[in-house]
Regions:
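Generic low-polarity alpha-helical segments
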Residues: 6-14, 176-181, 349-354, 469
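N-terminal signal peptide
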Residues: 1-6, 12-41
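Short, conserved phosphate-binding/catalytic loop or strand-edge motifs used
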Residues: 262-268
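Generic signature of intrinsically disordered, low-complexity, basic-rich segments
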Residues: 1-2, 8, 453, 497
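Short linear motifs in intrinsically disordered/low-complexity regions
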Residues: 8, 21, 170-171, 176, ...
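N-terminal catalytic cores of secreted or lumenal carbohydrate-active enzymes
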Residues: 72-257, 261, 277-281, 287, ...
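Substrate-binding and catalytic surfaces of secreted/luminal carbohydrate-active proteins
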Residues: 26-94, 98, 203-205, 240-257, ...
Length: 507
């Protein structure tokens, strides 16, 4: 789960457009475009006085649909209204049908991570620009994220490695305390985000490593497992450490919905890993949950209702982790779900992660396209939520003490007091803006097997239908959408090359 920014390279042209459009009497600010390298590389520029907004769906008449389109050439959430009309026998049209009677998983939400790097970059902006950035993610005129991930202590996207208790053999955690980074770069912006969402933001926390003195390696950076026997003091203390963290954040006004046991536990087998990691196998994580973490959470006021997620690693590991952990009834009673990463698809939730692309690329469409493809495939296979990595990064793709620079949906240029919304930001919004928590995926059938296009459909808690379509072709594609409840009628949507569309209509 991740993303970041790009180097402020010389651009061929810089074009700024500032438009206001009126929708039902409300002025909506459109994308202020800036081109980089080539005309297909487009970002939307925001600063202290201006930031683009997303027009609301509004009041739709019977048979009307609001259609939002974003494409490679700079169109961003362009809203039009179309209607269901009688079906025809036209050729060259892609036919598909949805059926809201056939329902699958319920959606938890979409979001990103409140890393130190994100907080440092948000903090580098003026108050007005900072507010516009947070509104872009969490506000009603933004893409309305409903999930936030919070690292427990440091990650590589910190300026240094730190823990909450560096006192060896402190098995009572009497020296536990949050770090300056929590108070400067995490908690203030988490609380603002919670307020912007009206309190619906679900937060989950994840550790990258226990303090070094608890590990076999003796240090946070690099792999290593918890020291001692599985029933020993290090395992007990580490379980209590989660509770201490939850209590400390609650005392500062932040309540958590969920928790993962360990970020990328398999990486902890590598002692030479370049940043914080800690090893669990499926068996050792199972035993840690049932013997220590589960009971510790269950008996605490802050942890008894926590949604605990296992694995938090590459999806290729999923079958064995589910089999080993969830077949054990004692462990399974504490587990609410499974967290997976998408790195093994070679398109991680933080694109720009491969050695040859360790940097942001301003305006790059291909990375947004990879996001859209992965999200559609995940949602089509029972995934209930999708969380990105860093909310924002600087032009270099950091800060990151391990120099593991990547890309992000928003790139911050602190010198200019502005930030750039990447195509990835808008791709995320085509899902997060229109699929609220509690929505259910519904049946979507293509009459002809999709080639270079795909889609996924939902019904919201207010019974609106939401359809997302992705065109990965280099040519336009026209879709004819039928719904079982609207027999004999179809909605036509034409998608330009390299584009995504979200259609919303009433029951």
């Amino acid at each position: 789960m991740c993303k970041t920014a790009t180097d402020c390279r010389v651009f061929v042209s810089q074009v700024l457009f500032q438009w206001n459009i009126s929708l039902s009497g409300i002025k909506i600010q459109k994308c202020q475009q800036r081109y980089y390298e080539k005309k297909e590389n487009v970002v939307c520029v925001c600063n202290a006085t201006y930031c683009d907004e997303i027009p609301e769906v509004g009041n739709l008449q019977p048979l009307q649909a609001a259609i939002y389109q974003t494409d490679q050439y700079g169109k961003r959430f362009e809203r039009t209204v179309s209607s269901f009309t009688e079906t025809t026998n036209e050729t060259g049209i892609i036919r598909l049908k949805i059926d809201s009677r056939i329902r699958f998983q319920t959606i938890i939400g979409f979001g990103g991570a409140f890393t130190d790097a994100a907080g440092i970059n948000i903090n580098s902006l003026s108050e007005s620009t900072r507010t516009n950035l947070l509104k872009s993610y969490f506000g009603s005129t933004g893409i309305q994220y409903t999930i936030g991930r919070v690292p427990i202590a440091s990650t590589d996207f910190s300026t240094h490695a730190y823990s909450y208790d560096d006192s060896p053999n402190d098995f009572t955690l009497s020296n536990f305390s949050l770090a300056d980074e929590d108070f400067k770069f995490k908690i203030p912006y988490i609380k603002q985000a919670v307020n912007l969402t009206g309190g619906v933001l679900k937060l989950f926390a994840s550790p990258w490593s226990a303090p070094g003195w608890m590990k076999t390696s003796g240090q946070m950076i690099g792999g290593g497992a918890l020291r001692g026997l599985s029933n020993g003091p290090y395992h007990v203390t580490w379980a209590n450490h989660y509770v201490k963290f939850l209590e400390a954040y609650k005392n500062n006004g932040v309540i958590f919905w969920g928790l993962t046991v360990q970020n990328e536990p398999v990486a902890g087998a590598d002692l030479s890993y370049k940043w914080q990691a800690m090893y669990f196998s499926p068996k050792t994580e199972r035993d840690f949950i049932k013997n220590h973490l589960g009971p510790a959470l269950r008996k605490s006021n802050v942890g008894r209702n926590i949604s605990l997620m296992i694995m938090d690693d590459q999806r290729t590991q999923l079958p064995i982790w589910a089999d080993v952990v969830l077949k054990d009834k004692e462990a399974a009673q504490y587990v609410s779900g499974i967290a997976v990463h998408w790195y093994n698809d070679f398109v991680p939730a933080c694109t720009g992660f491969k050695p040859f692309e360790h940097r942001p690329i301003l305006g790059d469409w291909s990375r947004g396209d990879m996001y859209a493809h992965d999200i559609i495939q995940d949602l089509s296979h029972w995934v209930s939520g999708w969380t990105d990595w860093n909310l924002c990064l600087d032009l270099k793709g950091g800060p990151n003490f391990a120099k593991n620079y990547v890309d992000a949906p928003i790139i911050v240029n602190a010198t200019a007091d502005e930030f750039y919304k990447q195509p990835m930001f808008y791709i995320m919004g085509h899902f997060s803006k229109f699929i609220p928590p509690g929505s259910a995926r519904i049946e979507l059938h293509f009459y002809v097997k999709p080639i270079s296009y795909e889609g996924v459909a939902f019904v919201t808690p207010t019974y609106q239908r939401v359809l997302i379509l992705l065109n990965r072709n280099n040519k336009s594609v026209t879709f004819s959408i039928e719904e079982r409840a609207k027999d004999g009628l179809a909605l036509r949507i034409k998608l330009k090359p390299k584009s995504i569309a979200t259609a919303v209509w009433n029951k």
